[in-house]
Amino acid sequence: MVSRRVQALLDQLRAQGIKDEQVLNALAAVPREKFIDEAFEQKAWDNIALPIGQGQTISQPYMVARMTELLELTPQSRVLEIGTGSGYQTAILAHLVQHVCSVERIKGLQWQARRRLKNLDLHNVSTRHGDGWQGWQARAPFDAIIVTAAPPEIPTALMTQLDEGGILVLPVGEEHQYLKRVRRRGGEFIIDTVEAVRFVPLVKGELA
């Protein structure tokens, strides 16, 4: 039994076109208020992005659901997340697959996310402090890669770390950004443009 606030959000997401009930169930299961500052707790279940510090944000639930749905996950999917951030998207993924790999360039955010995930008994996540542009070659290939910040172009390293049939979902662009889905098929990459979006930039390098 979910609260009225959670149910209202789920109804709104369905109205916005989210159809995957597994994704919606994952959103209902993850307490978004645990991933934001207490000052914003009353807005935790609003369908909006919220600041998490370090110039980063927690994405609006619609965008989390949309991007997750586009990955076409199964429980066996090998998943890489670029931009752990608050750990909220990571937690959604952890409810849907057996294991999640996640890379975060800001050390402080990585440690906060690890603590939150542990507190929620989500132990099927491996996090790494590093440059998201480079992916996680040692754990490749992946069936699904999700990027939660926008590079000006699709990073080559992420495309090459996709397994055959794998899907990469990410925002791309600077002033004007679009959500893209890249599917690796037969040695080729099929790129579809999904919709206009607004994300923080995917910065190269890493911060201590």
Swiss-Prot record:
Single GO cellular component term: cytoplasm
Protein's cellular compartments: Cytoplasm
Enzyme class label: transferase
Main location as per UniProt: cytoplasm
UniProt KW keywords: Cytoplasm, Methyltransferase, S-adenosyl-L-methionine, Transferase
Protein name: Protein-L-isoaspartate O-methyltransferase
EC number from the UniProt entry: 2.1.1.77
HAMAP family with a match to the protein in the record: PIMT (MF_00090)
One record GO biological process: protein modification process
UniProt cross-references to InterPro entries, sorted A to Z: PCMT, SAM-dependent_MTases_sf
